[in-house]
Amino acid sequence: MELNITSKSNPFGDTTAENDKKMLSNAFIETADFRTLIETDDRTIVVGRRGTGKSALFIQLNEHWKKDKKILILSFSPDDSQIIGFRSMLKPFTGSFNLARAATRLLWRYAMLMEIASYISSHYKLSSQISSETLLNEHLKKWNSAQGDILRKCRLVAKEYLDENNPEESIGDLQFNLNISEIENNIVSLLERSDRKVVILMDKLDEAYEPDNIGIGIIAGLAYASIELNQKAKCIRPIIFLRDNIFRSLSKEDPDYSRNIEGQVIRLHWDWAQLLMLSAKRMKVAFKLDIEKDQRVWDRCTADDLKGRNGFKRCLQFTLYRPRDLLSLLNEAFFSAFRENRETIINTDLEYAAKSISMARLEDLWKEYQKIFPSIQVITSAFRSIEPELTVYTCLKKIEASFELIEENGDPKITSEIQLLKASGILQSLYSVGFVGIRDKNTSSYSFCHDGRTPDKGFESNEKLLIHPCYWLGLNLNRNALAPEEAEEINDEYDINIISDNSAIRNKTIGQITTHLDQIPIGNEGATEFEQWCLDALRIVFASHLTDIKSHPNGNAVQRRDIIGTNGGKSDFWKRVLEDYKTRQVVFDAKNFEELGPSEYRQLQSYLTGPYGKLGFIINRDESEVLKSGKDLDWTKEMYQSHNSLIIKLPAKYISKLLQKLRNPEKHDAIDRQMGKLLTLYETSYMAIKSTQKKRRK
C-alpha cells in the first residue's frame, strides 16, 4: 500500500474544515443534505452539533457555486471581536428578545442588500446597471464610506437611527429611514434583468455567542432576514449555519419559531453507511487505493477483528456518529500503527486512540453544554470507575450523591440548578445531551440522543441505562468497549417527540411551582400546604446563598419558628444582612392570609433574638410587596423604632417572581440584586416615612 500523505500524524486530513481543503477537494462526500441545498431553495438554515460538517458544507457549497459564472457568492464568517462589537449597540434591548430580534432583522436585511449592491457595483460587467439607481447609489456611497467589516458598518447604521431612549419608535421607523423595501426591489430587479443569482453563505455565528436576549435576538434576526430574502426573490439565496445548542436556544425563546423557522431547517445527521463512505474515500486518497467498494477499502486498511462491517462499527462506538470524531480516531490509530512500521491498524491502535479521543469528547461535552447545563461536568464526573450499564434507580442515586459535593463547593448556578431540577430532571438532561442511552424493552436496543433532545416520557426505576461508549475510557469505566453484537443494538433516537431539554425542564419545574401557589386555598385550610410551598420555593430561590433551610427546626420551643436557613454571608445581600443585622439564622414566618396585623409583626419580632439577629421575613398572600400606608408601614416602623428589628414583607407572589428569574441559569445573581433593592427601599424610604399612627397621650 503506497502512502500519499504529507503528515503521518493526520493521514486522513485535518479535523477542522478550514485546514482540510486538500482532502475536501479530493474526498468530499456529496450527502443528501448537500444535494438538497444545491438543488432546491426550500431550506435556509443548516443546523448541526460540533463536528458534523457545517464548515465543510460551507466551503464546498462555495466551491460548487463558484463554477457557475451567473452566480455571485458572498461569504461571511465573523470572528469574536466583530460579534462583541455588534452586541454593544444592542444594549438598549437587553430586557427584550422581541426588540432585539426586530432591530437585528432589519439591520441584517439591510446589510445583506448593501453587500449585494456593493459587490455588483465592483463587478466589471454589472457595475453599469447600478449607476442609474439614484436611491441605491446614495445608500451605497454611505455604506462603502464606512471602513471595516459588515458588522461594524451595521453598528454605525444602528448608532445613527436607533434611539436608546425610545427603542420601540426608532425600530418602527428603521425600515423607512433605510428605505429597505425600495432598495430590495431595486436589487431584485437589477439581478433579474442581468440574469444573475446571489448566494450568501454565513458560518461561525457561534463566535462570542451568549445565550441572552441580545445573543439569541441577533441569531433570530439573521434567520428571519435570510428567510424573508429567500422567499421574496428567487435570485437571492441566503444560507446560514448554526450550531445545535444555539438553534435550540432560538427555538425555545422565539414564540413564532414553529410558524416561521421550523420548516426552513436542515439538521445534519450521519449514519454508519455514510461514515463508512467518508472513511473509505479518504483512505483511497491517502493510500492511493484503486478499490471500488467502501467495505473492501476498509478491510484493506485494517487487520484482525477490525475487518468487516462489525469492525467498522467497533470504531464508531467510540464516536458520537460525527465525522470529526471518526477522523480523529482514525488519525490517532494510524499514527500509532505508523510508529510501529505497520500499514494497517489493529485493536491496540484503536484502544490507544480511543483513550485520548474519549477524554477530548468528554471535555467537548462539558464545553458545549455548560452554559445551559451548568452542573454537567460535576454530575458526569460522578460516574467514574463504575459499570457503564446501570438502572435508572442507581443512576439517580449517583446523581443525588454528587449533590453534597456541589453544595460544599457553593457555585450558585450549579446549586440552584440541582435544587430546581432535582435528580430526575438532571437525568433527563443527561439523556438529552447523549451522555446516557435508554434500553428499549421491546427491541432490547439502546437509544441515544445526539441532538440535545429529550424523550417524551419519564424514566422508570427498573429501566436500564448505558453511558455512551465514547466516554467509557475518559471516565475509566470497568469496560472499555462494546461487543459488536451490543453495538448493533445501539440506535440514535431521531424520531422521538421533542418536548423539552435542560432549559425546558427548568422552565416546566418553575411553572409547576408558581401554578401550585394559586391552587392553595387561603386561610387555615391551606396553611400546612402553603408552608410546604414556601419551604420548597425558598430552597430553590436561595439555594446558593442559604444552607440547611428547614421547617420547624425547634418544635419543642415555646416560640414556633416556621422556616429558617443558615446565612453564611455568601452574597452581597446576605453579607449585608449578616453584618448590619447580625442575622446568622434567617427566619421566614409563613402566614397563609393576605392582611397582616400587629399580632403577626409582634410574633415575628419576638423570634428575633440571639443568632436570629434583627431582621426577619413574613411570607403572606398579598399581591404586592409594597407596604400599605397606615397598615403594614406603621407596624414595620413600630418594630424598627421600638425594638430595632426590621421585618420585611415577602409575599408568595414576590417569591414566584424571583423564581421566574431562575429560568436562565446565567442570571443566578439577579435574585441577590432584587433582594438588595428591596432592603434598600426599606432602609432609605419606608423607615424614613412618618408614621400615620397617633402618639398616645401620657
From Swiss-Prot:
Query: Its domain of life?
Result: Bacteria
Q: Which UniProt keywords apply?
A: Plasmid, Transposable element
Q: What's the name of the protein?
A: Putative transposon gamma-delta 80.3 kDa protein
**Naturally occurring in which organism (per UniProt):** Escherichia coli (strain K12)
